[in-house]
Amino acid sequence: ADTIALDAYRNAEKQCRQLLIDYEIKRENRVIDSDNTGSFFRFVNGKLSCKRGLGAINDDKGGVVTGDVERANLLNDYFTSMCVDDDGKTPAFDQVVSENLENIHFTPETVHAAIKQLKLGGAGGPDGFPPRVFKKLAVCIKDPLSLIFTSFMSVGQLPRDWKHAVVTPVYKSGAASSASNYRPISLTCVACKLMERVIVKQTLGFLRKHGVINAHQHGFLSGRSTTTNLLESVNDWTLAINDRKSVGAVYIDYKRAFDCVSHSKLLLKLRSYGISGQLFNWIANFLQNRTQQTRVGSSLSNITDLTSGVVQGSVIGPLLFVLFINDVACLFNDSSCVCKLYADDLKLYTVLESKVDCDKLQSKLNEICVWSDTWQLKISYKKCNFMYIGNTDCRVNMLLNDNVLQLVSDVKDLGVTVDAHLTFNKHIDQVVARAFIRSNLIHKCFVSRDVPTLLRAFLVYVRPVLEYASCVWSPYHVEQIKQIESVQKRFTKRLKGFETHDYKSRMSLLGIESLEIRRLKQDLIFTYKIVFGLVNNAASDLFTLTSSVNVNRTRGHAYKLFPHQNRIDVRKHFFSERVINTWNSLPAETKHFSSLPVFKRFLRDVDLRKINKTLIF
């Protein structure tokens, strides 16, 4: 009887395991068959992520908090403790724009356009209405919403519920038991976000018209990105090294900058930028009397008031912060020092030829400290760094409010590890190691051995790691090109049925390109954006058209670029130099350059190996 029962148990266990496998395969296929790339990424991220749920949190007294409500309250108290009390001072701030933007016009068309921008699978706010509801009912609700938004704008007020946020704590880095290592991401009402979206679009149009936002700010603005920020910086640095000079670069970190924005000081700046009337009143009301509570699991913390800051998770918050920090770049208008911003990520640098240049850099650091104190932004001195780029004999300590900056040989700059000699060796090692880990996890964690499933997971979860900001650091050494390519080579070789094919055959059968060719195409696409003014900042100075320097052009297209003579490899192989030969060798037909989508289709069909003979893969 025991033997019969054991056999029955084993058969039931086997059937149960098979049912679970079948269920998981169906679940994987259901997500894979959908066209929603975002949903697929979240699915893959959920399967492969090693992150665990929120664990125990240490309180101020050294105790350990484990309950959901207790952890929610502890985190919420920490987040609100970052708020600053206004010091009551009104700094001098000159009027920047003489014209005013007093009102925002809401029409059914502008509201409908805002609804279309919502992500179907996005999270809902405290009122429980997710974006899906608004998208499904867009045609029905666009008219009444436009009337509601117009009414709120005319009185300069918002409903109380729209000023409440439910915060999700997002782990950053460091000890997971410390509340300081979590970032608050606020979920606010979707209806309010729609209104904000219309406001932001029209406000940005006004600000661009009057040239308000500094050209060195790259955060949250169309045509600007982390890549444009990095390209402009590395361009300056490679030029200096090519001229046998060095660079001193300082990275400044602000502590919880978004949470520390003084409302009264922000409103002072908005007035000087021409924001007035009903719009000014609405923004003032948007900032005032805000509340939040933090969610852990299914539990919510107590509700607390927010006395400063702009909401992370709102639509208008990033723009308000950009305007608040905007004038810090004005400190460098008449200076040999250069400032680059990405939201609150600030770096400043200067070419060093003598100790006088070090003194000038120190002088600007002193001005940064005064500016930060005036506007009540706290500098996190321990996270600030100083790096010499290139070889120099001028080595001195740099100070921020009497704090000696840590001298480093490499630094993480907007996700790219930049070293003192601009080799990017460490960055390439890091991204390849990370990509291999993710690649191995895909083979390990997916139940299905289906090739399209695993390949799509690789394309959305691994390949972006190897391609982020590649225009900045794309390698030219054969060993590094092979090192990066090895990730895709090894992954495709492990796919079922592809073990015996060579790499070129595997790519052809799978319909993918080598990572080397993809980096070249990204170079060409970014060049197109710069040449045709789709990147609206100083990155446009990276190239010179041959037509503008009186160079005879007997063959080729009308957008050829002027090449330069360079002394060292890091300049010869920098983006704006390495791409020129390939760009100038593109076919002469101007139809290929009529628009960016047309140019991308052209690149999809052209064989770049026939144009660039140096390609390895």
Please tell me what each predicted stretch does:
Residues 199-217, 300, 318-349:
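Active-site palm subdomain of RNA-directed nucleic acid polymerases
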Residues 1-66, 117, 441, 459-466, ...:
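Arg/Lys-enriched, amphipathic patches
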Residues 403-472:
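Basic, alpha-helical interaction scaffolds
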Residues 363, 378-411:
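Short, conserved micro-motifs composed of acidic
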